Amino acid sequence: MEINSPMNEKVKNWAKLQQKKYRDQTGKFLVEGEHLIGEALKAGAVEQLLIEAGRTNPFEREKEAIVCGESVMRKLSANVSGAWLIAVCTQKTTAPAGLRTVVLEGVQDPGNVGTIIRTAVAFGFDHVLLSPDCADVYNEKCVRSTQGALFHIAISRTELIPALNELKELGVTVIGTALQGAQPLSELPVSENIAVVLGNEGQGIRPATLDICDQRALIEMSSFESLNVAVAAGICLYRYRRCG
C-alpha cells in the first residue's frame, strides 16, 4: 500500500492526532523516529507504521509499513524538516495502581513531564499519576522527552486528593516537596512503597494536596530558592530509587 496525497482521508485523520482533542477522542497519538518507535513496538503500542518512499523499514520483521510520499510525511511530522518514519500508536487504556508512584500536580511544560516520566522509569517507579491540569503526556514534545520510557510505565490522569487517599489506604507513604515546614530530603526515612508529589513549576503543590502528604521534603541548596521541577524530581526519585 502506498499513499502519496496529503488529502487522502487516512492522512487527514492521522494529521488530526497533532491536536489534543483528537488524541483524547481516539486514544491514539503519533510517534516519530526510529528509537521511539522501537520502544513502542516492544510495548505492542504501534497500530500503523508509516515510512517515506525509498526508505528501508528498520522494523521489517516486527511490523509491515505503509509507504507514504514525502509531502504526506511532512504533513504528519511535528518537525519542520519532516520525518521519514512515523508510527500511529495506541494510548494505554489501563494503569494498574502502583505502590511506587510519581505524582505530578499542575506541571505545565510537556518537556518537564516527559523528562520526569523518563526519570521515574530509570529509578524503578511503576506509575506516574497526573492531575487533570498537567501537560498532555501524548504531546509530541513530551513523547520525545520520555525517550521511549512512556511505553514502559503505567500512566493515569485523575483528581489527586482521592487518588492519594487511596494510595495511603494501601500503605503507601506520600511525600510532597515543599519549601516551608519541610524536613531535609536526606533525613527522611527511605520507604519501598512511596508516592512522591511534585507541583507546578511556579506555584508548587497546592495547600490542600500538601495537607494530606505524610511528609514534606526539602531539597537542601546553597542559595537558590528553587529548582526546575524535572531536576527536583531527579533528586527525589534517586533518593527512593529501586535498582535491578
Q: Locations of the language-model features?
A:
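Active-site/ligand-binding-proximal alpha/beta "capping" segment
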Residues: 176-224
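Amphipathic alpha-helical repeat scaffolds
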Residues: 33, 108-116, 227-232
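Short beta->alpha connector loops at strand-helix junctions that form conserved
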Residues: 68-69, 105, 131-132, 154, ...
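RNA substrate-binding interface of SAM-dependent RNA methyltransferases
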Residues: 90-180
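Short acidic-hydrophobic, aromatic-tinged amphipathic segments that line or gate anion-handling sites
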Residues: 2-5, 66-69, 153-163
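Structured adenosyl-cofactor binding patch, chiefly the S-adenosyl-L-methionine
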Residues: 87, 122, 137, 142-149, ...
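Boundary-proximal intrinsically disordered activation/regulatory segments immediately upstream
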Residues: 1-55, 134-135
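Glycine/small-residue-rich loop that forms an oxyanion/phosphate-binding "nest" at active or ligand-binding sites
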Residues: 65-90
